[in-house]
């Protein structure tokens, strides 16, 4: 089976800083893959290049065999790539349902937010997505009144609007309390399941990584330090030294 995502010799520099150093990686359909590494290791740079927010200096990014390395985020989304952000990208003055309705309408500016949010069909779809995450009772609450963990889930719900084949999540449990992190991740996995999307998630919490990832890719100074099943990677001596500090 061909990989849903294939990256070859991907390079990205910011001045003297090497953010991606000959990255080569295949991601099969249906896997849950966690990207780990210290701050600045290259994880978010990788996600930004795959989703079109950053152009690589060289190398190729193939989605189902289509070169997407120079496409815009909107174009990448049309082909089946979607993402959430470490800091949720929401309109705080709108309700949860209105934010999702804006995403459903494809309008990304503030100039005409209310009209699409009032369309019944879009609202029904918005509430359906919120129900997946157990958040339907918050549909009419303004984002400004919602806790950080709930905002994360709504941001991820927005990423599911297009039913992507590849979903990239940037630290889905950051800012979520220790008591809520497993519940949050359970909701994410459950909610993505109907679309059968491949999930790539950046994560610093090794408990989350070991519980939810089928495969772990460890980054260090723009390179892939280790790649394999969680137990193998998290016990790798170089990973323990440079990434986890011995923490599992």
Give each language-model segment a name:
Residues 2-248:
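Glycine-rich phosphate-binding loops of nucleotide-dependent enzymes
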